[in-house]
């Protein structure tokens, strides 16, 4: 029997990470804690960069934008998940699903682009230190962030609009804790060739493109560091990009891990569990990575809490 084609659907069902009732309180507490830590940590980074004039530099300007993107990124998925657990409902409206998917794609792409921009900033700082302030002027920094927003927004809108053209069947269960683009497309009854091509193109543009840029920047950075004669000079140069390199590694490794897990198991629930790493863990860990070894951030936060300028 052929599935019924329904173009006037009103809602989807999010199956979540687990269907076990006894696990729901634990999941609620765990993800609420992770969400609050993520929002608070990234807000502190933004507060530090705004309040301390010494941090009004391109590196911290990009970092504050990344923190804002991380707050928005995690806020597109976790609050709805917590509401569903608390109300014991798995339903999300059609409009809500499309909106969630749109913003998830937007801020996921923005994260990737901002990491590439930050890699370029570190490249200029280490490879062209004498011309750093001239090259990384406020106008260029603003344009780089604006371009990142525009590219991510155009991709998000195009992906979402293509989903709106799809027809869906009676099986509207999404084996995930949020409306993930690939999962939603696979529920469609109509032809998804254009959607699949759009996803692959976007993956190449917003994942492959920034990754190539980051690798090129760091290849130049490594060459410059190797040319430095003193060990102290090498350590100082490397320490300026160590935090960014850690965040990039975390972002890429978790994303690759989710992809490999999905390809190896073909189990949607396993994929959903693995995706927690890049949707929740990465935004949560970023503030800790940037602040633990960053004396400037620590000093700015101490001054903010003490009420000093």
Swiss-Prot record:
It is a multi-pass membrane protein. Pfam families: 7tm_4. One of its GO terms (cellular component) is plasma membrane. InterPro entries: GPCR_Rhodpsn (IPR000276), GPCR_Rhodpsn_7TM (IPR017452), Olfact_rcpt (IPR000725). Its main location: membrane. GO terms for biological process: signal transduction. The chain crosses the membrane at residues 26-46, 55-75, 100-120, 140-160, 198-217, 238-258, 272-292. It is found in: Cell membrane. Residues 1-25, 76-99, 161-197, 259-271 are extracellular. Residues 47-54, 121-139, 218-237, 293-309 are cytoplasmic. Disulfide bonds join 97-189. It comes from the Eukaryota. Glycans are attached at residue 5. One of its GO terms (molecular function) is olfactory receptor activity. Keywords: Cell membrane, Disulfide bond, G-protein coupled receptor, Glycoprotein, Membrane, Olfaction, Receptor, Sensory transduction, Transducer, Transmembrane, Transmembrane helix. Belongs to the G-protein coupled receptor 1 family. Odorant receptor. This is Olfactory receptor 7A17. It comes from Homo sapiens. The gene is OR7A17.
């Amino acid at each position: 029997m052929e599935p019924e084609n329904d173009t006037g659907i009103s809602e989807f069902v999010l199956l979540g990470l687990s269907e076990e009732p006894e696990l729901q309180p634990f999941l609620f507490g765990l993800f609420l804690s992770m969400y609050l830590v993520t929002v608070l940590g990234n807000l502190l980074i933004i507060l530090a960069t705004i309040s301390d004039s010494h941090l009004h530099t391109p590196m911290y300007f990009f970092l504050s934008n990344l923190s804002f993107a991380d707050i928005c990124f995690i806020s597109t998925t976790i609050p709805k998940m917590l509401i569903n657990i608390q109300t014991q409902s798995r339903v999300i409206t059609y409009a809500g699903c499309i909106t969630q998917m749109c913003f998830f794609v937007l801020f996921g792409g923005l994260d990737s682009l901002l990491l590439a921009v930050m890699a370029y900033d570190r490249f200029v700082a280490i490879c062209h230190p004498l011309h750093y302030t001239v090259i990384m002027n406020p106008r260029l920094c603003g344009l780089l962030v604006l371009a990142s927003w525009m590219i991510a927004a155009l991709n998000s809108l195009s992906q979402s609009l293509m989903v709106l053209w799809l027809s869906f069947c009676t099986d509207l269960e999404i084996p995930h804790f949020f409306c993930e683009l690939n999962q939603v497309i696979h529920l469609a009854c109509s032809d998804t060739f254009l959607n699949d091509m759009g996803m692959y193109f976007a993956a190449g543009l917003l994942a492959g493109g920034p990754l190539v840029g980051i690798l090129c920047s760091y290849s130049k950075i490594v060459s410059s560091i190797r040319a430095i004669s003193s060990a102290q000079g090498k350590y100082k140069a490397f320490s300026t990009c160590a935090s960014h390199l850690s965040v990039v590694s975390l972002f890429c490794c978790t994303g690759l891990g989710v992809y490999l897990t999905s390809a190896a198991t073909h189990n949607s629930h396993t994929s959903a569990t693995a995706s927690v790493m890049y949707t929740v863990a990465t935004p949560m860990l970023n503030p800790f990575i940037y602040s633990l070894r960053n004396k400037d951030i620590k000093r700015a936060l101490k001054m903010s809490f003490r009420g000093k300028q």
